[in-house]
Amino acid sequence: MNTNDFDFELPEELIAQTPLEKRDSSKLLIIDHRQKTMVDSHFDHIIDQLNPGDALVMNNTRVLPARLYGEKTDTHGHVELLLLKNTQGDQWEVLAKPAKRLKVGSQVNFGDGHLKATIIDELEHGGRIVEFSYDGIFLEVLESLGEMPLPPYIHEKLEDAERYQTVYAKENGSAAAPTAGLHFTTDLLKKIEAKGVHLVYLTLHVGLGTFRPVSVDNLDEHDMHSEFYSLSEEAAQTLRDVKQAGGRVVAVGTTSIRTLETIGSKFQGDIQADSGWTNIFIKPGYQFKVVDAFSTNFHLPKSTLVMLVSAFAGRDFVLEAYRHAVDEKYRFFSFGDAMFVN
């Protein structure tokens, strides 16, 4: 298949720049790919799509304030680092601007020298491996000096950084939020649990590759980014029990889907506790092994995320649903509305 097969017209004014006042007041487009039906609803009605005995699987990663502004120790030139992933100890892969000024051995100071970074390796596309030195606890230093890394298509400043975190965010490590989860409130989750739905959490630390456009025409040539994931034994056991009892595994967002399907592919359809790195690329032709239904936001044209949704529900039907969403003025991307896919 070709990348252009997943293109669609999206008016720029439909790209949501700010979150709604209430998390669960966003719109929800409910689609059933077998019946070929679409229903316009609101997100707090997602509870009606869940049955007692189902499992609702959420990604509990927490977004790091991963954007750092500092200056080179020798020239005092301004430098921006965006933390991508912790490679080992105090070493991180980062995206550096301007990268050409940062050679191996260069040092950068942040916050009056409370945090220092030394460049230890150069990667392509402005990537660098840096080693940090600091006093105290790294995450606390980062909280005091770093800024929330909003996606490139959001141009307005976020007044409350917690609105770019899910209410169940727990495990530090992401460069971007698992945005399908932003719609849930604590109260809505309590109601869902009271209905007899199992709430299950996994972790996938979202990298910036999630925003990287597909740069090749032939999908078979696309090099998918890697992200760290983890599923506990307790969570795996709950999911096995749900499947055995005839319940559904309902994933919240593409990051939960990619984690569950990575594990399902690795263990021949079985659900086992596991952790590691995944670069799974789910596109039409893929056979789903674990996930029975899911919620997700509306994604960028020609993105791997539109391809993932198309793998589950069929490209033509998904693009028809997207055209409907555009016609009905749904809000798109990270702070936008949601879709529930049966």
From Swiss-Prot:
The keyword S-adenosyl-L-methionine applies. Pathway: tRNA modification; tRNA-queuosine biosynthesis. Keywords: Cytoplasm, Queuosine biosynthesis, S-adenosyl-L-methionine, Transferase. Transmembrane segments: none annotated. Its EC number is 2.4.99.17. One of its GO terms (molecular function) is S-adenosylmethionine:tRNA ribosyltransferase-isomerase activity. GO terms for cellular component: cytoplasm. GO terms for biological process: queuosine biosynthetic process; tRNA wobble guanine modification. Its main location: cytoplasm. The keyword Cytoplasm applies. It catalyses: 7-aminomethyl-7-carbaguanosine(34) in tRNA + S-adenosyl-L-methionine = epoxyqueuosine(34) in tRNA + adenine + L-methionine + 2 H(+). SUPFAM superfamilies: QueA-like. Monomer. Belongs to the QueA family. HAMAP family: QueA. This is S-adenosylmethionine:tRNA ribosyltransferase-isomerase.
